[in-house]
């Protein structure tokens, strides 16, 4: 892949995390505690944006390459809250691990200095269950879910096995590029 030189990227991250003190016994180590810090997620998303912007051969919406200022929201919520969102917006019963709500459209870009990508919601309870099921850390699972939600904000979909495989491979690529 060809690398491009890019200028400074700005990110406005709106981060919110519920009180999950009931899980404090499962979230003890210092690396895991990072998932509750806004500055951590800002660095993660900036890393991913920079990784994407340095390559010319990704099939992403053109506007991603035209702007250098982005905004997105990330909320870490409960199963109950994500189940409510899942029912209201996806017409699906029960909790899910991650939901993304992209809001960017070509029409909304004309006079904007900053691209509003949308919002990502992650269920901490589902992430804990899945980290146990897949035998990796909650830190790894949260990064995985955030990368999945982030790619949906950029227009990625997985309506078939081929698209899903490409998306999952790209998620892994982004995760391996984190410093």
From Swiss-Prot:
Pfam families registered for this protein in UniProt: YbeY (PF02130)
InterPro entries: MetalPrtase_cat_dom_sf_prd, YbeY, YbeY_CS
Statement: the UniProt record of this protein carries the keyword Zinc: yes
Cofactor dependency: Zn(2+)
Co-factor remark: Binds 1 zinc ion.
The EC number(s) this enzyme carries: 3.1.-.-
Keywords linked to the UniProt accession: Cytoplasm, Endonuclease, Hydrolase, Metal-binding, Nuclease, Ribosome biogenesis, rRNA processing, Zinc
Protein name, per record: Endoribonuclease YbeY
Species: Prochlorococcus marinus (strain MIT 9312)
Phylogenetic classification of the source organism: Bacteria, Bacillati, Cyanobacteriota, Cyanophyceae, Synechococcales
